[in-house]
A protein has these predicted regions:
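Proteins that catalyze or organize thiol-disulfide redox chemistry
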Residues: 1-30, 35-60, 68-75, 79-83, ...
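Conserved residues in the N-terminal Rossmann fold of short-chain dehydrogenase/reductase
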Residues: 63
């Protein structure tokens, strides 16, 4: 059983925390740009949770609500949802727009990392 006080596998980030949580991270970070109203984003969420758990300690997985965080959304030119950006050493090294099945998402991530 999981302890409810544990941090979720996919942590939220904001315009304020993005630089520390993503750009200055010591390992690769997968950012899920999503919105509450986005159906495909909700469909993708369980796969991202599993990927975060499977890669704990190797890759951080975070999510950013585009409606609540317009600064970062604009900075990275996010237009379609869901959008996934993979960062290494503060730089975008891979991107994916749209919903992918979990197997394809895992393959994309493995190739990008």
């Amino acid at each position: 059983m999981s302890d409810k006080s544990e941090e979720p596998a996919v942590r939220p980030v904001t315009d304020v925390t993005f630089a520390d949580d993503v750009l200055a991270a010591g390992r690769p970070v997968l950012v899920d740009f999503h919105a509450e109203w986005c159906g495909p984003c909700h469909t993708l969420a369980p796969a991202l949770e599993q990927i975060a758990e499977e890669n704990a300690g190797r890759i951080d997985v975070v999510k950013l609500d585009v409606d609540k965080n317009p600064e970062i959304t604009t900075q990275f030119g996010i237009r379609g949802l869901p959008t996934l950006l993979l960062f290494k050493a503060g730089e975008v090294v891979a991107s994916q727009v749209g919903l992918l099945p979990k197997a394809r998402l895992k393959a994309w991530l493995a190739e990008a990392v």
